[in-house]
Amino acid sequence: MGPSWNVESNDGSQIAGYELGGSGEVLLIAHATGLCGAMYQLLADHLTDRFRVVAFDFRGHGDSSGSSDIDYGWDRMAEDVAAVTEHLGAETIHGFGHSMGGAALLLAERNVPSTFASMFLFEPIVFPDDVSKEGQNVMGLAARRRRAEFDSRADVLYRYAGRPPFNQVRAGFLAGYVDNGFAEQPDGRVRLKCLPEIEAQIFENGRQIELSAVQHLTTPIAVAVGRDEPGPNPARLGPPLADALVGGTLFRYDHIGHFGPLQDPWTIARDLVDHVAKASGSNI
């Protein structure tokens, strides 16, 4: 899927946007680190009867700008969100954010209050001020070890389908990632669009975002978490965030993990629609 449009972020980075279908109030999807906007089409398919669903690629991802000299701080990610919402120019925008995408939506709302009428965030990476950020260090190290090039898209699909985390997601999401998250090279091989070094920088920059930066927000915000698992786990960040937010509500899902929206899009879509309806006081 090629971009539906492009918009310029504050520093000149080009941000690619995707119209995923539907009409009505806008639902903006903000993807997780290392992924891309277009691969969330299967989630959008459960929402297009209620919303005009739009996704985009953060800088360093998909078809957006991704050179090594770009600033990948999460404040810059929030500026990418702002560029997209300004481009959309819609009266009402609801946000869905996954992991880093959720944190970026929160920062964008902090910077410009009332950007979003409501938000549904799955395991946004926002640390309590007194909690160790070691998990992001581990993720950065792991990202740098990722293989960047493969013989073909079929090779990627075969390899990723047999190992975590992509062996846990619906096949359509993995296919969307392989189609949209890799670029063909002159020799016929394919290469990650979000290169390992850039992904690592983004993970490491996530340590900058703390709860005190966003806890004052009054927007109706659902914070959703999957099951608690051994080791550094973003699910543990959700309850303190939901408790601290003025308009926060916590959703728990014991049957899915950090890639939950890609594992059970129907349940996530159902609860998102219910959350938006309660936030707006309507039956959409």
Would you name each region that the model predicts?
Residues 16-66:
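Conserved HGGG/HGGXW glycine-rich cap/lid loop of the alpha/beta-hydrolase fold
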Residues 183-243:
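Conserved serine/cysteine hydrolase catalytic core
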Residues 149-205:
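Conserved alpha/beta-hydrolase catalytic His-Asp/Glu region
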Residues 10, 58-96, 270:
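Active-site loop/oxyanion-hole signature of alpha/beta-hydrolase fold enzymes
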Residues 253-266:
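Catalytic histidine-centered segment of alpha/beta-hydrolase-like enzymes
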Residues 110, 117-149:
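Flexible "cap/lid" loop of the alpha/beta hydrolase fold
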